[in-house]
A protein has these predicted regions:
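Active-site loop segments of alpha/beta catalytic cores
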Residues: 64-67, 85-199, 213, 217-219, ...
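Short, solvent-exposed loop/turn segments at secondary-structure junctions
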Residues: 72-74, 128, 218, 265
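Alpha-helical structural signal in soluble globular domains
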Residues: 54, 111, 150, 154-158, ...
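Short helix-terminating capping/connector loops at secondary-structure junctions
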Residues: 59-63, 113-118, 157, 206, ...
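Catalytic-face loop-and-helix region of soluble metabolic enzyme cores
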Residues: 181-294
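Noncatalytic linker/hinge segments flanking ATPase motor cores
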Residues: 17-29, 104-113, 159-169, 203-209, ...
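Glycine-rich anion/phosphate-binding loops
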Residues: 36-53, 91-107, 231-239
Length: 294
């Protein structure tokens, strides 16, 4: 069966008080996050510690390093209480969940900052695809943006950039109108849906926002098998042309504010396809650098 949080008993309320004490110690009394409950361990975050090991080897030509964590909306709408009600709807528990995720992201930022490279932390928000649907009818845009504002702050005040990744279609204005630095989206499948928000996109880019342009497919194996660098490059150039036209911004200014990325993660793919996705990403990026950037 599905696990849930038992919010009705006394033990939960004791735990909640303890959580806020730990939170206050970390945020107001400068307790070292590494000594707090917000520090991850190898059992909970094996991939993160593998990344740190690789960074210790100081491989050449790294320009930045990126962490990732479940976003507050996806977490708080996915975790339920004993009545199968999402904890997002319980204001006190939602507040604790947002602070919990924000401080784990802050801990990640501190760990990644040791390598003297620019740090980016992404919040993964697949649930945003459901915003505005009947399932989330009572959740307001302001509530969502307040959650983003808080988690962004924990990371940004430590000198890192934040991103929000959604691998489906979404109301992109929520991210574009927030203080998030980077919008990460599946440009392979949903580019036309993003263009609907051209005004928000223009404002976002003009205030220095960046786009992680997921032009390399990861969702359908047939797409991965079929695609090559030239196809994806020409798809990208068409999209760039369209974005420049719709936002009234120059292609060169847009090119300075984008990253070429896979459309989503490769964790569900076999190794051969995962490696192809990464080499396509590198190949498309190199081709754009050599042929488009002045």
């Amino acid at each position: 069966g599905q696990e849930y949080i038992q919010t009705a008993n006394e033990e939960f309320h004791t735990d909640l008080v303890e959580f806020y004490e730990e939170y206050m110690a970390a945020t107001e009394n400068n307790k070292d996050l590494n000594e707090s409950k917000f520090a991850l361990d190898n059992k909970r975050a094996r991939g993160f510690f593998t990344l740190l090991e690789k960074l210790e080897e100081r491989p050449e030509a790294i320009n930045a390093v990126k962490g990732q964590i479940t976003g507050p909306i996806t977490f708080a709408t996915g975790v339920k209480d004993q009545n199968k009600k999402a904890i997002f709807y319980e204001e006190q528990i939602r507040d604790a969940a947002v602070k919990h995720l924000g401080l784990i992201a802050a801990w990640q930022t501190e760990q990644l900052s040791k390598y003297n490279l620019p740090v980016i932390v992404f919040f993964d928000e697949p649930a945003l695809a459901g915003f505005g649907s009947s399932e989330f009818i009572s959740i307001s845009k302001k509530e969502v943006m307040d959650c983003f504002s808080e988690v962004n702050e924990y990371v940004q005040q430590r000198g890192a950039l934040t991103g929000i990744h959604v691998c489906a279609n979404a109301d992109w204005s929520i991210i574009l109108d927030s203080e998030t630095n980077i919008l990460s989206f599946d440009a392979y499948s949903f580019f036309d849906k993003l263009l609907i928000f051209s005004d928000s996109l223009q404002n976002f880019l003009q205030k220095g926002g960046q786009i992680a342009w997921g032009i390399v497919p990861t969702q359908e194996k047939e797409d991965i098998d079929r695609e090559n660098i030239d196809n994806l490059y020409s798809r990208f150039t068409e999209q760039l042309e369209q974005l420049a036209k719709d936002t009234n911004l120059s292609k060169q200014s847009i090119l300075r504010q984008i990253y070429i990325t896979p459309s989503c993660g490769t964790g569900s793919l076999d190794r051969e396809r995962a490696e192809k996705v990464l080499s396509l990403t590198r190949g498309v990026s190199d081709k754009i650098r050599s042929e488009l950037i002045l």
